[in-house]
């Protein structure tokens, strides 16, 4: 029983090998451009997959009986402040609508910041006085979800949260629950903004406010604030060291940002230090200019430990990048992508989407990424946030240019014709159950817990794709895997805290019962599915 998962994979491999052996003695007849034996082989493999899937569906209820009759006890990892949590022990924010929430008056926020810069108030005023905070109502209007709020000083504000109420309802429903409640320390004391659960998954360190571009929009208003703010080496080291002291001590991806982080004199040194102290992933949010200018700089960054280039990318031609004020910026991006990929740095296309400016580029950018899937890992579309250089935007322009997560889901379908908004999209936090599974499988003695994104479901969404790099074709994972159900299955498996061999067997069973052989790509085999899942959970299954 301890090797049951291995047996399932080997059954598939042996079945394939037997078919190959038989094919050696087959007559080859052309059938629509393919050999008859190849057709028979593929058909046999699909039959074998269906048998395994059917067997898994029969076994699954039996495993659930075992889990109800006998459950193990959760342990407390040394990186965590408490024993591992079951779903029933997790807490949830308030969802649905109408509901009230805490918000900010955009005018008050600006006034408070200016008073601190002028020396009229200390920065601790932000922590102790909660300036600019007001209540807001989240309601549905004409099928849209909007936030409505009133400031006694500056009047009424209204903004769109979603253009599709059913979409937002689905996203909130899939939230898996909060992580550990975080112990309060002086490092976490940020007033109302204090992270109260978990610890986040990305530590963003702004190395400098200098930049070699003049973008519009710019979240940071780089180069325009009238002074240079650049972290000294002691500051960088202190931030990275302090982050390691916070529990739960989960792994994080450190993202160096700015301004343009590559302009910092400590950029390479900071990357090296991250790897030395144990951060497993280091990325840079960059416009790519320095990497385009110098392949040697890209190599130096890779050698230091840079894993991901979070590359600003607004469209697939120079015209779509004109708001960045560089006429040939797309050509620069192509050179940066080539240089980064050549040395082994993963490239993520990061697109700030502004409604009526570049929202038509969503489909072309996805297609560009698919066509260059040997160089590009994934796309990150970021709906515009009116901060920094754009905080003085008029209410009329804000409504005109507002772009929400629901806009993105519908634009992907409209511009690619492939995905389904109410099936293929998930909150980023939906990956939490897989992190919980990995935490259990890795045992109590790990120095770090698994990376876990616990952000609010209104914060970010994602869609998993299966890409055929040879044919440049793609499918959403939900087309051939019941992702909604497998997430629930993983929660049930982890909550049972069974012996590891039984947990592994149940995970393989869950993968099989949620696999749809008839809709999967022809090249996709069950053993590939198991191996990919194992890779995504940090090798917890092997």
Please provide the spans of the model-predicted regions:
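Radical SAM enzyme [4Fe-4S]-AdoMet core and its adjacent flexible, acidic
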Residues: 2, 7-41, 45-46, 50-57, ...
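N-terminal [4Fe-4S]-dependent radical SAM core
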Residues: 74-204
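Amphipathic alpha-helical segments that form well-ordered structural scaffolds
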Residues: 104, 273, 335, 339, ...
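Conserved alpha-helical substructure of the radical SAM core
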Residues: 145, 151-153, 158, 162, ...
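A short acidic, helix-capping loop that chelates divalent metal ions and anchors anionic groups
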Residues: 224-226, 317-323, 389-392
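Flexible, glycine- and charge-enriched loops at secondary-structure boundaries
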Residues: 225-233, 323-330, 398
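Radical SAM/AdoMet-radical enzyme domain recognition
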Residues: 237-255, 264-383
């Amino acid at each position: 029983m301890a090797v049951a998962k291995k047996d399932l994979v080997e059954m598939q491999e042996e079945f394939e090998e037997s078919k190959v052996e038989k094919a050696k003695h087959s007559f080859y007849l052309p059938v629509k451009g393919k050999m008859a034996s190849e057709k028979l082989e593929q058909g046999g493999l699909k039959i074998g997959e269906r048998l395994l899937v059917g067997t898994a569906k029969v076994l699954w209820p039996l495993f659930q009986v075992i889990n109800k009759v006998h459950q193990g006890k959760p342990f407390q990892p040394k990186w965590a402040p408490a024993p591992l949590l079951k779903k029933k022990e997790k807490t949830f924010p308030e969802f649905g609508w109408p509901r009230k929430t805490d918000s900010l008056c955009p005018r008050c926020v600006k006034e408070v910041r200016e008073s601190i810069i002028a020396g009229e108030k200390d920065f601790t005023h932000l922590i102790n006085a909660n300036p600019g905070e007001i209540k807001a109502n989240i309601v549905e209007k004409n099928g849209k979800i909007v936030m409505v709020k009133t400031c006694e000083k500056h009047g009424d504000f209204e903004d769109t949260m979603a253009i599709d109420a059913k979409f937002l309802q689905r996203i909130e429903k899939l939230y898996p629950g909060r992580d550990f409640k975080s112990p309060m320390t002086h490092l976490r004391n940020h007033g109302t903004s204090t992270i109260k659960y978990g610890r986040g998954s990305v530590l963003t360190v702004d190395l400098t406010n200098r930049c070699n571009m003049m973008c519009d929009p710019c979240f940071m208003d780089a180069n325009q604030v009238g002074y240079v703010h650049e972290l000294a080496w002691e500051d960088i080291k202190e931030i990275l060291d302090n982050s390691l002291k916070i529990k739960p001590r989960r792994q994080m991806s450190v993202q160096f940002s700015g301004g343009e982080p590559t302009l910092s004199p400590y950029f390479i040194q900071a990357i090296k230090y991250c790897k030395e102290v144990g951060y497993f992933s280091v990325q840079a949010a960059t416009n790519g200019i320095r990497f385009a200018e110098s392949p040697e700089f890209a190599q130096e960054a890779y050698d230091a430990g840079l894993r991901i280039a979070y590359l600003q990318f607004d469209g697939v031609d120079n015209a779509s990048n004109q708001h960045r004020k560089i006429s040939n910026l797309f050509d620069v991006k192509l050179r940066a992508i080539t240089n980064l990929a050549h040395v082994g740095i993963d490239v993520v296309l990061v697109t700030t989407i502004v409604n009526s400016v570049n929202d038509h580029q969503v489909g072309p950018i996805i297609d560009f990424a698919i066509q260059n899937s040997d160089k590009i890992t994934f796309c990150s579309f970021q709906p515009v946030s009116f901060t920094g250089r754009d905080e003085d935007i008029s209410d009329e322009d804000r409504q005109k240019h507002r772009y929400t997560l629901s806009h993105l889901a519908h634009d992907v379908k409209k511009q690619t014709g492939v995905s389904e908004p109410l099936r293929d999209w998930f909150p980023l936090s939906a990956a939490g159950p897989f992190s919980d599974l990995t935490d259990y499988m890795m045992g109590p003695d790990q120095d770090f817990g698994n990376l876990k994104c616990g952000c609010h479901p209104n914060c970010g969404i994602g869609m998993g794709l299966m890409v055929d790099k040879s044919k440049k074709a793609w499918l959403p994972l939900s087309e051939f895997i019941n992702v909604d159900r497998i997430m629930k299955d993983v929660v049930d498996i982890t909550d049972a805290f069974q012996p590891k061999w039984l947990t592994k067997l149940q995970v393989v069973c869950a993968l099989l019962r949620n696999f749809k052989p008839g809709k999967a790509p022809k090249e996709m085999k069950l053993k590939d599915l198991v191996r990919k899942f194992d890779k995504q959970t940090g090798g917890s299954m092997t």
